[in-house]
Amino acid sequence: MNKGWLELESDPGLFTLLVEDFGVKGVQVEEIYDLQSKCQGPVYGFIFLFKWIEERRSRRKVSTLVDDTSVIDDDIVNSMFFAHQLIPNSCATHALLSVLLNCSNVDLGPTLSRMKDFTKGFSPESKGYAIGNAPELAKAHNSHARPEPRHLPEKQNGLSAVRTMEAFHFVSYVPITGRLFELDGLKVYPIDHGPWGEDEEWTDKARRVIMERIGLATAGEPYHDIRFNLMAVVPDRRVKYEARLHVLKGNRQTVLEALQQLIRVTQPELIQTHKSQESQLPEESKPASSKSPFGLEAGRTPAASECTHTDGAEEVAGSCPQTTTHSPPSKSKLVVKPSGSSLNGVPPTPTPIVQRLPAFLDNHNYAKSPMQEEEDLAAGVGRSRVPVRPQQYSDDEEDYEDEEEDVQNTSSAIRYKRKGTGKPGSLSNSSDGQLSVLQPNTINVLTEKLQESQKDLSIPLSIKTSSGAGSPAVAVPTHSQPSPTPSNESTDTASEIGSAFNSPLRSPIRSANPTRPSSPVTSHISKVLFGEDDSLLRVDCIRYNRAVRDLGPVISTGLLHLAEDGVLSPLALTEGGKGSSPSTRSSQGSQGSSSLEEKEVVEVTDSRDKSGLNRSSEPLSGEKYSPKELLALLKCVEAEIANYEACLKEEVEKRKKFKIDDQRRTHNYDEFICTFISMLAQEGMLANLVEQNISVRRRQGVSIGRLHKQRKPDRRKRSRPYKAKRQ
């Protein structure tokens, strides 16, 4: 039992995999690099690594302090999980168990649950024996350790297990019953550091205690902190991101249904007018968009996309008449996947569009310089081109695989099932399962609805009434800005705008990266309604949007509720609660950290009140929003979806790297060495190598040995009187 535990490295990936091997769910370990910064999110406990020799030297200076803070009461000590470390090299497992078994919001699994129930009320020494005699813990512990080298018998006498144990040591800092405790298995009693302040978290006090300990051990030298390491036991971020994505995707569906319900309630006569055309137009649009899962009709596409062909800083010149629904399908410009569809038509002559190469050549963009792209953009050529995503084509085979995955994810993301049964006036097309917002009559109704509500919008628009058709076409020329959301090839809903509120997931490094355009759902709707480069792409306009201002801060923490009259409100308000209710949090499927996650929701609501986002004149309640406000909210939701999907992928990739590093760490290279030596022997090279190494060792060993052996006999000979007579 005393020689079966191996020494573990201080690595967050190793501790994360060790926690999983214990059977614990929803927990991971992260490394803390800065003690000055406040910890973000809930923390279960800290694991502190230090050099035991330095700690023993500094402990003599503060012996009275340790005695004063030690908890001697047996009832208090036995009520918590504090175990003496009786097995050498088991301090890593002791530190993890001291954090996990003293936390009530963690799914411990069967192994640790039995351990906690069995050792309840035991003394620290008995708990230490229970840990040392648990084969499941020892097996999981040793599975992540480096294989120990096989020492020669004469060299093993100089090494002791106690000396190896004292090299580096792990201790835990855990909050228990409102007080900060330091649990060190090599000390007789736990250390009570007292309660933390009312206006601070327990992590703030723990950071101060650790900084004082580091300064005491290093005698105030700030550049010796490399001998210490700090890790935090936190909830699994994958569970959090998956829960947020579940809520965000549900809210995206709710916002899309709100757009549909807005048409059904406010414009029922237009639904009857276009009811006969709804069954005919999808058949006409098949040649233009053969493989596109959300192809728009050719008649309405040029009406909005050709309206905006300016540089983004000038007003729209000329008229943009709204074409009828019987336009030939050869004018279709909105095709999501150019490789799967062919543009066999010629651009209409009245529009000032410069002729380009064919689509299959022009979109490939073999060797076009950035200067040529800017010139084309200034000339208005880029506005008429087929909208494709950046880096659509590449010479790398992995990019093609990512493209196919993105198309599959996009087609699956825009298909959803309606909550209620289809009404007679419903616009949803049940045959193909597409979003009814993208149907032709819905687009016409949203366009007319927007034209009626333009005077109430605070966003400056450039409106030009055409003399031919008599209906105004809206176009807002702005520069397309890159998204502050992280760029990721796996996100099928990456939006062109950022979040409406400060998301904790964004970093300056991610914000500097360019991203792909918005998702097909919002991009097609915004192109038809507001032009290809509408003002919704601007982050400042999104920030002052009414729907985003009201629902943005809670869009990722609580589900939205759509009433029958079109009122959109947070689900917690309909239940009569404040902010997001615990039932909403539990529906996200987060395990082990429900109370901590609820605390985050309260913090989001409080920060919203402090920042002045809540208007004092109007209470936070359900309201009706215009189509443009709903589209802005939809872009906000999709930006958050892209953000969380990127972060989720990062966590998944991080786990893969943890496993790869663990395999490299624990791999036994003895078989490879034996095979290599046998191959050298077969080639006749082993004998020469052995002779060379033996000769070198003899020279070094003999010279050093003679020096030590000659000194002692010389001293003894000089002390004898008969030797002096001979001289």
UniProtKB/Swiss-Prot annotation:
The modification Phosphoserine is found at S292, S369, S394, S519, S535, S583, S595. Ubiquitinated: monoubiquitinated at multiple sites within its nuclear localization signal (NLS) BY UBE2O, leading to cytoplasmic retention. Able to mediate autodeubiquitination via intramolecular interactions to counteract cytoplasmic retention. Monoubiquitinated on at least 4 sites near or within its PY-NLS. Residues 320-330, 426-435, 478-522 have a biased composition (Polar residues). One of its GO terms (biological process) is in utero embryonic development. A motif (Classical bipartite Nuclear localization signal (NLS)) lies at residues 697-720. Possesses 2 overlapping nuclear localization sequences (NLS), a classic bipartite NLS and a non-classical PY-NLS. The classical NLS probably mediates import via the importin alpha/beta system while the PY-NLS mediates nuclear import via the transportin system. This is Ubiquitin carboxyl-terminal hydrolase BAP1. The lineage of its organism: Eukaryota, Metazoa, Chordata, Craniata, Vertebrata.
